[in-house]
Amino acid sequence: MNKIYNEFINYSKNNFKRNLSWLDRDVDSPTHGSFDRNYWHYKITDFNSDILQQGIYTLIALYKENIPNSYNKLKLKKLILSVTKYTIKSYQKNSSFNEYYPNEDGYPPLAFISNVLGDTFIEFPEFLELKNIKKTYKEINLYLSKLTEFNASNQYAVGIAGLYKFLKFFPELKNNVNINFHLNNILKLQDNEEGWFNEYDGFDLGYLSVTLEALSDIYEISENHKIINSINGIIF
């Protein structure tokens, strides 16, 4: 294993429990599955910041043993399902997701949640067959497909990655999602000479790393040569 990967494993082993402390694991709690401790525990806010549901990635990494651990896999899977159900329920409540304030209906939480749900269902496709999950997952992505985001490329790229993952399960909805329209849009946001993507009229290395990861996910699914050319523009 290379040095960077070893450092990542080290960091993960030392910090994943801190991340899990944000999760409401009480099966009798009405907020069971929420990753927003400020909401369900401290009561600092009166709504769930849905974008924090991405904490599910830690659970999935533990389940797949990408982070070494000795946890019971069945218990981990139940926790992953609880987060998935709570995320779906959060959308059902308002037909949107919130991040910073109630009724925000923000693009970032919608995009990132679409993406994380796609990754979750790729690992656990059986979750899609549970009551209301498939229906709501479709609603989330059909709504997302109607939106664009030209000021923050990282958000748009993640949203498009979420749509590509959605189409793995529902290829018959490709025309409804208009995926090529979104793909062409995101590629136009890249600087042709230097390879960076627009973030509020400029360059941002941190956001660019998010865009790079999203484009890599898109390429893995689509194998579109335009994407690999774009990725090469970022790296080289």
Residue ranges and their predicted role:
Residues 1-51, 74-86:
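Low-complexity, Ser/Thr/Pro/Gly-enriched N-terminal "stalk/linker" regions
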Residues 45-69, 73-222, 227-228:
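Aromatic-lined, polymer-binding surfaces characteristic
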Residues 37, 41, 223-236:
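Active-site/pore-lining binding-face segments in mid-to-C-terminal subdomains
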